[in-house]
Amino acid sequence: MSKQKHSASSTRWLKEHFDDKYVNEAKKKGYRSRAIFKIEEIQNKDKLLKAGMTVVDLGAAPGGWSQFAAKVVGEGGRVIACDLLPMESIAGVSFLQGDFREEAVLNALLDRIQPDMVDVVMSDMAPNMAGNLSVDQPRAMYLVELALDMCRQVLAPNGSFVVKVFQGEGFDDYVKAVRDLFKVVKIRKPDSSRSRSREVFIVATGYKG
C-alpha cells in the first residue's frame, strides 16, 4: 500500500505551521489559535475593545478572538459568538452553532443580542479555499458582505467593526462601502499574518448608524 503523497503546497503549509512562532506561542499560552495574536495586535493599536462592551464574533471557531475579547470586556461585558463549526465553551462567551444566513439561526443570534445594541462586530470568517482565485475570492467577499450587513442590523451608533478581507476583486468596492458607514477606516496587516497571505484586516470606527 503506497503512502499518499502531500502536494508541494500542503507540505509547505505544514512546515510553516509547525515552524511558526505564533503557533508555538499560542500552544504555550493555552490560546485557541494563532489568530488571537492578530486581534491582540489590532487591539493594541486601535483600542476597539473596552471593559463592559457587548461584542459579536462571526466565524468564531476555534475561539481565539472570542477568548481574547472575553478577557478584555470582562464580567460586565458580553461576547456572542457564532460559527458553522462547533466550538468548545469559553467563560464569558455565549456561543451559537449554525449558519446565520438561515432565518432561524439569525433570529436566535439576535435574541441573544437584544435588547442591547452591539459595541463591536468582529469577523474572522473565511470560506473553505478551493485553491482557485476566481472561485475563492467571490466566496470570501460574500462573507465579508454578510458581516457588514450584520453591522447594519445590530451595531450601536459610534460602534466599531473589524473584519478579515482578502485583497483581490471586489476589495476596493468593499472598502468604499465600509467608509460610507464608518467615520474612520484603517487597513491593518498584523505581524502575525503570514506575509504571503492576501489577508488584511479592515478596522472601522465611528459607525454612523
From Swiss-Prot:
<protein>
    <recommendedName>
        <fullName>Ribosomal RNA large subunit methyltransferase E</fullName>
        <ecNumber>2.1.1.166</ecNumber>
    </recommendedName>
</protein>
<dbReference type="GO" id="GO:0005737">
    <property type="term" value="C:cytoplasm"/>
</dbReference>
<dbReference type="InterPro" id="IPR050082">
    <property type="entry name" value="RNA_methyltr_RlmE"/>
</dbReference>
<dbReference type="InterPro" id="IPR015507">
    <property type="entry name" value="rRNA-MeTfrase_E"/>
</dbReference>
<keyword id="KW-0963">Cytoplasm</keyword>
<dbReference type="GO" id="GO:0008650">
    <property type="term" value="F:rRNA (uridine-2'-O-)-methyltransferase activity"/>
</dbReference>
<dbReference type="Pfam" id="PF01728">
    <property type="entry name" value="FtsJ"/>
</dbReference>
<dbReference type="GO" id="GO:0001510">
    <property type="term" value="P:RNA methylation"/>
</dbReference>
<dbReference type="InterPro" id="IPR029063">
    <property type="entry name" value="SAM-dependent_MTases_sf"/>
</dbReference>
<dbReference type="InterPro" id="IPR002877">
    <property type="entry name" value="RNA_MeTrfase_FtsJ_dom"/>
</dbReference>
<comment type="similarity">
    <text>Belongs to the class I-like SAM-binding methyltransferase superfamily. RNA methyltransferase RlmE family.</text>
</comment>
<feature type="binding site">
    <location>
        <position position="63"/>
    </location>
    <ligand>
        <name>S-adenosyl-L-methionine</name>
    </ligand>
</feature>
<comment type="function">
    <text>Specifically methylates the uridine in position 2552 of 23S rRNA at the 2'-O position of the ribose in the fully assembled 50S ribosomal subunit.</text>
</comment>
<keyword id="KW-0808">Transferase</keyword>
<feature type="active site" description="Proton acceptor">
    <location>
        <position position="164"/>
    </location>
</feature>
<feature type="binding site">
    <location>
        <position position="83"/>
    </location>
    <ligand>
        <name>S-adenosyl-L-methionine</name>
    </ligand>
</feature>
<keyword id="KW-0489">Methyltransferase</keyword>
<keyword id="KW-0698">rRNA processing</keyword>
<feature type="binding site">
    <location>
        <position position="65"/>
    </location>
    <ligand>
        <name>S-adenosyl-L-methionine</name>
    </ligand>
</feature>
<keyword id="KW-0949">S-adenosyl-L-methionine</keyword>
<feature type="binding site">
    <location>
        <position position="124"/>
    </location>
    <ligand>
        <name>S-adenosyl-L-methionine</name>
    </ligand>
</feature>
<feature type="binding site">
    <location>
        <position position="99"/>
    </location>
    <ligand>
        <name>S-adenosyl-L-methionine</name>
    </ligand>
</feature>
